[in-house]
Regions:
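Positively charged n-region of N-terminal signal peptides that target proteins for export
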Residues: 1-4
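Hydrophobic helical h-region of N-terminal Sec-dependent signal peptides
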Residues: 6-14
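C-terminal segment of classical bacterial N-terminal signal peptides
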Residues: 13-22
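N-terminal secretory signal peptides
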Residues: 25-83
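Envelope-exposed proteins and targeting segments
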Residues: 37-39, 54, 64, 87, ...
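Mid-chain, structured segments of secreted extracytoplasmic proteins
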Residues: 65-111
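Thiol/selenol-based redox catalytic cores and closely related redox-interacting motifs
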Residues: 92-155
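N-terminal targeting pre-sequences for secretion and organelle import
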Residues: 139, 144-177
């Protein structure tokens, strides 16, 4: 009987060793294909995986794609490529980090969460309830896609100055440490 208990215990430990790594792998969030294809923002170099909650993917009618870290960089690309019409514009849902349709998303402008590449946050949500829940916690106002694009362009000058100042400070800090 004792040998049977030891054998069953050993078998249980062996099975755990086989099962647990697979379960742990299954629990890890899968990296979305757009992040694999466009790991960093071509404009600023930021990691799109790290900023999955704000990333954007623009698919143009000519078949080209642009993966940006944020609305800020996406509107810059659309402004530079005026002759290329976007066929599809996707954005990371703030809560789930999954890509959703940017034009039908419920957006929140402002609040106490600083934006990505922007002082004023501009966040996308799949549902109005999620956006309203964010507003209760962090403030801001509901907006549609047209309003958020307009806000991004309105903020462009001050955001660009802020980014330049940050980069200048980072460069000075790097120079100081070397």
């Amino acid at each position: 009987m004792r040998a049977l208990v030891i054998t069953l215990s050993a078998l249980f430990i062996f099975m755990q060793a086989l099962i647990l790594p697979a379960a742990a792998q299954g629990d890890a969030p899968a990296v979305e294909q757009d992040i694999k294809d466009h790991a960093s923002c071509p404009l600023c170099g930021m990691d799109r995986g790290k900023f999955a909650h704000s990333r954007m993917l623009i698919e143009y009618e000519d078949g080209t794609k642009y993966g940006a870290c944020s609305l800020h960089c996406a509107v810059l690309d659309m402004a530079v490529n005026l002759d290329k019409a976007p066929a599809k514009i996707m954005v990371g849902d703030y809560d789930t980090k999954k890509l959703i349709n940017a034009e039908t998303a419920v957006w929140v402008i402002g609040g106490d969460k600083m934006g990505v590449m922007s002082k004023r946050g501009k966040w996308a949500f799949a549902t109005k309830a999620e956006a309203e829940s964010f507003i209760k916690l962090h403030g801001g106002q509901l907006a549609d896609f047209d309003a958020v694009i307009k806000a991004a362009f309105e903020d462009m000058a001050t955001d660009t100055l802020m980014i330049r100042e940050r980069r200048k400070m980072m460069k000075a800090k790097q120079h100081q440490n070397s």
